[in-house]
Amino acid sequence: MQDTSKQYDAVVDTCKSLFIKKMGDYGSAWRILRLPSLTDQIFIKAQRIRSLQQNDVRKVDEGEVSEFIGIINYCIMALIQLEKGVVEQPDMSTLEATKLYEEKVSVTKRLMEDKNHDYGEAWRDMRVSSLTDLILQKLLRVKQIEDNKGKTIVSEGIDANYQDMINYAIFAMIHLNEDKS
């Protein structure tokens, strides 16, 4: 589990670094996005990953890793939007956004550690394609919850689904990094 924690942190560092750089380029323009818009952005990334996994020919020179980073960062933005609400104008400094980013990652990592303990790191025996499918399944669930105006009868809420997608994407990146080495 110690290895998992270090690997998890390394993936998060990569994602957070890109998030901060994009905050420098664009500011917090993402703060105007409603949750369904963020969900759709994540869906596009996950669909592209699935297409890359199924097709041999690529017309755009970006691989799975950059798409998984996008999924992680968009999910964290969605968690921030759930907490802070949508705004009409960008309103957040890089410092404040980074602090919120780190808070969301911390809670999500704790969830991963708890589930990892209970499931015995079962994700290590899963294929990246299966993790991609789980992300797509979670996205379909989130879309349904959004269509139901956020109401669920017995299921966990949108935030838990975003957290699971973050963890699945991080697991996929750990697998892809291990395959490289």
Where are the regions a protein language model picked out?
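Intrinsically disordered, low-complexity regulatory regions
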Residues: M1-S181
